Amino acid sequence: MILRLYPSRLRGTVSVPPSKSLLHRELICRRLAGQTTALPPHPADDIRYTAAALAQLDIPAPTVYCGDSGSTLRFLLPLFMALGKLDAVFTGSPRLLQRPIPADLGLCPTAAGLTLTRPLRSGTWTLSAAATSQVVSGLLMALPLLPESSDIMLTEKPVSRPYLDMTCRVLQHHGVVVAETPGGYHIDGGQTYRPAPLLTAPDWSAAAYWLVLARVQQQRTSGGTRNDLRVALHDTQAEDTPLSCGVSPGWQGDSIIEEYLRDVPQTVDLTDTPDLLMPLALYAALQPGRTTRFTGCGFLRGKESDRPHAVAQVLHTLGAQVQEAADSLVITGVSGLHGGCVDSFGDHRIAMLAGCAAMLADGPVTLTGGEQVAKSYPDFWKDMAALGGRTEVLEP
């Protein structure tokens, strides 16, 4: 899809979708507890892939298509192994199959996809989570099903640590106990998943785009007090529900990024909150004369795109000052962005970055790959139009 996006001042209230990070985990845990889960209206593509894959647990020799969903693939590989579904073949987009998966799982790449060569074993797993924590989450959900106990030993500090915390808290919600140890986790075997109410939370990584737009619009208003754009956040069903981007669950409203937006620090470490790179980079790009260094970005090169490079390319094309290094981005704010032609790099979060940047630019932006938002936020363009964003489809 090729879109032409025109500078627009957004007005109104937008409701963000539910957290797909939390819903992935709930779909799996509820399935293991014998529960069914109704998907939300217009579910993200990643959620549809996980739901469809779980349905294939009941059929012989399934081909499990994961699309571009790293969560679906890395969460479910250990689960299928634990349940003895060794006749399954996992496949997905070419980019997904290039993303890191530990050799310890014993997968066999074939022309058809990834095949499982052995059941999941209990015992000690020594893993690195420096590139992704998703396989660790997958093991945390699968190992309790085995008869014997297991330990996970992490060889270095994991990235996206709050997502591991989310996994543990969802497991606890379903009666599965995982003990954190100094070097990783201890998991008792022979555990049973317990039915429990569905946990929900807003997708803060999606909300961050609108919150940045609202703040920049407010900054551009005389006096800096008028705010025409508001973000409505769905209430959680449990007080201690973890939030999707890994911040403290007690935060409310726009306080998820308030700390950044109030006074952008010189250095922002994104190791634990990687999905905030795109919206915060846009915000930093529009703070004239201020330089912000985003660190902990190296592992983002193995996401749906090489995200640090994609962010740098999109913002540079639109007039921002960006310096790219192996593990960091350095952005010096400018007074405004201009129009241009950019690409989503096949990445939903880059497409949303480009869309928001276009609203704040001084000329139209042509975006190739606008359909990528369906991966996490299918209604993104619809919501933008409802808020007054002018969009034109040049090529479906």
Regions found by a protein language model. Name each.
Residues 1-396:
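Structural preference for solvent-exposed beta-strand-turn elements
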